[in-house]
Every structure is written in C-alpha cells, then in structure tokens.
Amino acid sequence: SVALNVSLDYLLKGEKENFILTLPEGNLTVKTDKGDFKGILGTYHTLFHSTVPKEEKWLQGELELVADAESRCKAEYRLDTGQRDSSGEAIYKCYTGQAIASKRLPVLYIILGNAQMGELCFVELRYRAFHTRDMECRMGLVLTTASGDERLPDIHKMLLFRNQINDETLETMKELLQIVNS
C-alpha cells in the first residue's frame, strides 16, 4: 500500500468509481441491448506476467463485463496482487470502466481506471459478436503502468478465459504471453 500510496483497506475492499465515457452513436458502441455484445458479457479469469521488471511472477484477476442500468457495457476488474496483508488476506487492485466495440474494426476496447491510484489501463482484443455461444477465451494487449518502484508506461499480453484452465494448458499459455524484445 505504501508503494501505491493508498490505504490497505482500499486495496482489500476497492472503491466503486465511474469511468464511463459518453460516445456518440456511430462506429463505436457501448450498448449491450443491440446485439453487439452478444456472447461477450460475463465473467472472465485473467492471466498475465508481472509488470515489475525482472520479477518472475504471474498475476491472475477477474474481469466482469455486465450491462449497467443504461444498457452500457460496464467493466469491473479485480487483480490479485499476489501479496498478503498483515492478517494474511489477499490484496487486490480494483478497477472500473467500460468495454467499447468497434463496428468497423474487429476490436473490443476495455478502458479501466482507478482514480485513487491515478491509473488507467487500456485492453484491446480481437472482437466479434457471438450468436450461438459465448466467447470462451481471448488474448489481448494491455497498455498500463508498471507496478513496482519505477511506475513507467508498460505493455503486456493478457489471457482472458471463462473456465479454469488445467496446469498443463496454463504453462503452455504462459509461453504465448511472453513479449520477446529483439
């Protein structure tokens, strides 16, 4: 909590914030009642490599995409930091925002923010509406701020999946999530 400059209580419980953009109707949509988010809404597990330089740790979280009261696609993300407080409870970072679907490009944008930490995260993933089943898995690219002492801009790959994955598949996916510098 000291590194993030927030209270431990905030990291444990989070805070509801409003990071909803107002977009004109057109080539981008946030509306869940028009079929653009069919098969997309629901809860996803996430996996990505730690953004702390030289730290060999994989982080997991949970992303919920739900329709809000105005039929916009609201996003809530809860990231398990892998750390524990003094009573042994897991410490989470919580973000809120929204998902935006492009009607012209095969891209879903998820914009997440945490006002208390002063942080925004942008997730892009391949998109299409699903008419006969739900989206099960996607790999996305994330633009965010690194954790740790430096807190510099950072990119990483993120895996989103609905159902838990067995350990063998998880290890294979970790290899695909690496970004190799050349």
Q: Would you name each region that the model predicts?
A:
Residues S1-Y10:
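DNA major-groove recognition helix of helix-turn-helix/homeodomain DNA-binding modules
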Residues K13-K38:
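Short, charged recognition helix plus adjacent turn
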Residues V30-K74, L160-D167, K174, Q178-N181:
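Short, solvent-exposed loop/hinge segments that bridge or flank secondary-structure elements
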Residues E55-L59, A90, C121:
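Short glycine/proline-enriched turns and hinge-like loops at secondary-structure junctions
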Residues L65-G113:
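A contiguous binding-surface segment within folded domains or other stable secondary-structure elements
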Residues K93-S182:
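C-terminal regulatory/effector modules of DNA-binding transcriptional regulators
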